[in-house]
């Protein structure tokens, strides 16, 4: 929602929009309701129902050819997974028309530190400064916002449900939640997360 509000200050109409990582379509629905456009292109690793109605690319955006002559490229909570990020930003810059917009949100260093303290693993998130340095090489930054928020959950199950719904989990793949580890997490939960 913050991304949409920041973006809407600068752009209300964009003929050709490309969304990277449309996922379940939460941000896409904002675009559909509030932006005038001629073409919307969607990208995600997996097919979602919205992809039936718009030109789409299924697969890693780093391996896809980004449509050209774009007026707007958007992405919500995807770029923390992209390596190498600078290569993708170069592709985006080349695909945008001159003086058009690239707007995104992403998770940065410090995300889900509570979960990392329990699992002893986390993703190698970039710092805001590292992201700015990459951006300055390819774009003029019109607006930069950092938003730190803490979500609270009534119990361990609610936390895990939220992680599942958002796809954000901070894990690199070798942590498995077993009955024993769930019990330990539940015992250590005590309102910390």
Residue spans for each PLM region:
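Class I SAM-dependent methyltransferase SAM/SAH-binding core
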Residues: 18-65
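Conserved Class I S-adenosyl-L-methionine
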Residues: 24, 143-193
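A short SAM/SAH-binding and catalytic strip from SAM-dependent methyltransferases
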Residues: 71-86
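A short glycine-rich, Lys/Arg-flanked "PGG" loop and its adjoining helix->strand segment in the class I
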Residues: 86-101
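Conserved class I S-adenosyl-L-methionine
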Residues: 101-128
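Short alpha-helix
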Residues: 124-139
